[in-house]
């Protein structure tokens, strides 16, 4: 009775190597699909991964074929409409509806739908936050924030052909063949010695010599059947993500919850901050996050209250900046911490308060932070706060501004604010 031994180590994911190769090959199309999909779902809904669709034309293999232009001579069966040397005009639009994707309908022809497949939670987050990093991150005196980088980590028994280690695979092949044939080779040597002794003995023992020769031939066949290389022998260079100490960092999240922020605007602000939280927790092992809500008064709150509290009031943006400055002085020494801030507001502020915000940022906050981002969420025209901040953007490289009008603007704005930059040591 024969047995099949499954030596594959991928468990249920027996096509993982092919899947990873596919994700690398069509990364740009997949990232575009994810960018489109994030606007149609909650950013917190990541447990189920994401269904990704790729136009079928993008994954078809290239092929040579005749172009649609020019004149071609064909021989067709005759009928009562056409005679020899008649010219037949091509149908407008290039044919009768064959093709894929969106376009005009045709009465005949065939096409294919977009290719749709499911990616996991980890694959979704890796692609979502690829090429993003905290800007201007520098190494300070105390290193607690941990980044992950890819390093060589020995060998593994599964991987892609590009990472195969020929030397290690041949070493394993030699060891396996030696172990599997050692007893047979030892028996073969004994039989050969016995046969040699019988050939030199008197009188000749022909029947015994013939039996030993058959046994020797069978042993040689068994040894020859042991494959030179087996999938069990293959070894691939292994790579793993290792935590590397970097500078410690803190992110201040300042959210306007005043009465001018309607529910739709607040929801967009929360979605931006949830995206920021997922990015920080996914990319960095240790990072402090300080949540500040403000209307006429600012208050440091926990994560639950920041996202779900219903408290509201008037608008004095400077109250949040003053509180941030106090927290920095009390807990986060700029010489030891990389300080970041993300402020979201609808831009509506008490008229006399906007110049004070400009002064607080210019004199106290921007000199000590690595990066300060302001996100204005409104469909209306910009007001005094935006104009005050525009002056800061022109003077300070570590100050950035973006405008969100619709929910579909959130992810592109987020990527623009936190795209990976050169890191100073």
UniProtKB/Swiss-Prot annotation:
Compositionally biased region (Gly residues): 92-108
InterPro entries per the UniProt record, alphabetical: UPF0229
Region (Disordered): 84-110
Family, similarity comment: Belongs to the UPF0229 family.
HAMAP family per UniProt: UPF0229
Protein name: UPF0229 protein YE2273
């Amino acid at each position: 009775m024969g047995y099949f031994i499954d030596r594959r180590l991928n468990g249920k994911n027996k096509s993982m190597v092919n899947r990873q190769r596919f994700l690398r090959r069509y990364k740009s199309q997949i990232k575009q699909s994810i960018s489109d999909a994030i606007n149609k779902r909650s950013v917190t809904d990541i447990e189920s991964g994401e269904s990704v669709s790729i136009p079928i034309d993008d994954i078809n293999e290239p092929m040579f074929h005749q172009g649609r232009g020019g004149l071609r001579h064909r021989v067709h069966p005759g009928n009562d409409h056409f005679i020899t040397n008649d010219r037949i005009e091509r149908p407008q639009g290039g044919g009768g509806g064959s093709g894929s994707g969106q376009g005009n309908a045709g009465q005949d022809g065939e096409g294919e739908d977009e290719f749709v497949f499911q990616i996991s939670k980890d694959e979704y987050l890796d692609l979502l936050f690829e090429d993003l990093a905290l800007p201007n991150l520098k190494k300070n005196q105390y290193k607690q924030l941990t980044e992950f980088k890819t390093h060589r980590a020995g060998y593994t028994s599964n991987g892609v052909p590009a990472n195969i280690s020929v030397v290690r695979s041949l070493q394993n092949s030699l060891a396996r063949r030696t172990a599997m044939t050692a007893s047979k080779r030892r028996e073969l040597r004994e039989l050969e010695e016995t046969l040699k002794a019988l050939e030199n003995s008197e009188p000749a023992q022909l029947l015994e010599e013939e039996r030993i020769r058959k046994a020797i031939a069978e042993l040689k066949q068994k040894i020859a059947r042991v494959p030179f290389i087996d999938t069990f022998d293959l070894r691939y260079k292994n790579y793993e993500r290792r935590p590397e100490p970097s500078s410690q960092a803190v992110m201040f999240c300042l959210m306007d919850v005043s009465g001018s922020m309607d529910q739709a605007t607040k929801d967009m602000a929360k979605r931006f901050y949830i995206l920021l939280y997922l990015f920080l927790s996914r990319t960095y092992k240790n990072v402090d996050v300080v949540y500040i809500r403000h209307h006429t008064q600012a208050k440091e709150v926990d994560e639950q209250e920041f996202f779900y509290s219903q408290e509201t009031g008037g608008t004095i943006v400077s109250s949040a900046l003053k509180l941030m400055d106090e927290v920095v002085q009390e807990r986060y020494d700029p010489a030891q911490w990389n300080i970041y801030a993300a402020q979201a507001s609808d831009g509506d502020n008490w008229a006399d308060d906007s110049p004070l915000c400009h002064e607080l940022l210019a004199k106290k906050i921007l000199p000590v932070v690595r990066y300060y981002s302001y996100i204005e969420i409104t469909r209306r025209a910009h007001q005094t706060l935006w104009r005050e901040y525009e002056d800061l953007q022109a003077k300070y490289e570590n100050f950035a501004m973006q405008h969100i009008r619709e929910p579909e603007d959130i992810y592109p704005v987020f990527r623009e604010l936190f795209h990976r930059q050169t890191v100073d040591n």
